[in-house]
């Protein structure tokens, strides 16, 4: 299979939308419309390059509820104190000002493929000729009994960047001396398999400097994890005695329940 480059993808998109909207284009009155749902790395990049490489021939609208996007990549560097918070945040102003993308800050509620419309949380609709869906992931709060949107402010999952990573950093820095940091990584499959263990490593880095008698307990529902040998060798070398990884055979299985009290 031949690789599809960004430029050939945009050329294909331009050609296909032109065919779809041929009567409008032939009169010179209406540009074909591409709507992108989701302003993360994937959606924002798609919106930018469709607008840029079409040289304005395509009317591009990006629908994203948040006014700032905080990257998961580099968030560990913020967590460990190697970058400041603002450095992982990005606004959408550049897309509008430099690339002519229409940015709509609202929730996309539903898609009517027959009418070619996206319905927004406000009740308005946005029409399209071609639709790009890049909503990213979200947390299934009800998958853990007792967990909720409200609970995440006290027991951060930090699986999404931004405020969640900020809460996590503040809590780690304010742990009592000799306290215990506990993590329950998710079962497979999930996005970025090494992610929880990268977080553990950075938390250990903070504690080694700020709270060296603290302990980290990893209660894992898996018998093994991504890059396990490398992580455990690194933990033993840099944080000896601080991190305890428990597999199901050791801890007997995870009871998926959280107490309203964040430290019970």
Question: Model regions: which residues?
Answer:
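A glycine-rich helix N-cap at a beta->alpha junction
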Residues: 234-248
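N-terminal secretory signal peptides and thylakoid transit peptides that target proteins
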Residues: 1-17
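Glycine-rich dinucleotide-binding loop and its adjacent helix/turn
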Residues: 135-210
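Short hydrophobic core segments
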Residues: 127-136, 259
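A conserved short coil-to-beta-strand element within the FAD-binding core of flavoproteins
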Residues: 106-114, 247-256
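Beta1-alpha1 glycine-rich phosphate/pyrophosphate-binding loop at the start
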Residues: 27-102, 187-229
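A short, basic/flexible loop-to-alpha-helix module at the beginning of a structural domain
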Residues: 17-30
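Conserved small/polar residues in nucleotide/adenosyl-binding loops
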Residues: 257-264
């Amino acid at each position: 299979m031949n690789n599809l480059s960004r430029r050939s993808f945009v050329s294909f998109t331009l050609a296909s939308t032109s065919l779809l909207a041929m009567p409008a284009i032939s009169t010179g009155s209406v540009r074909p419309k591409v709507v992108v749902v989701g302003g993360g790395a994937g959606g924002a990049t798609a919106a930018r390059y469709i607008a840029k490489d079409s040289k304005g021939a395509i009317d591009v609208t990006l629908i994203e509820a948040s006014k700032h996007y905080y990257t998961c990549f580099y968030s560990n560097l913020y967590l460990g104190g190697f970058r400041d918070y603002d450095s992982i945040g990005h606004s959408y102003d550049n897309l509008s000002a430099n690339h002519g993308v229409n940015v709509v800050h609202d929730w996309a509620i539903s898609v009517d493929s027959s009418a070619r419309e996206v319905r927004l949380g406000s009740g308005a609709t946005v029409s399209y000729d071609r639709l790009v869906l890049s909503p990213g992931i979200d947390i299934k709060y009800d998958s853990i009994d007792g967990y909720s949107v409200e609970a995440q402010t006290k027991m951060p999952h930090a699986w999404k960047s931004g405020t969640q990573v900020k809460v996590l950093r503040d809590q780690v820095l304010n742990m009592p001396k000799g306290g215990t940091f506990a993590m329950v990584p998710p079962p497979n499959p999930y996005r970025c398999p090494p992610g929880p263990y990268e977080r553990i490593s950075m938390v250990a880095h903070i504690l080694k400097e700020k709270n060296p008698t603290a302990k980290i307990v990893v209660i894992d529902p898996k018998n093994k994890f991504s890059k396990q040998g490398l992580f455990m060798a690194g933990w033993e070398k840099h944080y000896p005695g601080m991190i305890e990884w428990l597999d199901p055979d050791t801890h007997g299985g995870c009871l998926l329940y959280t107490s309203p009290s964040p430290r019970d």
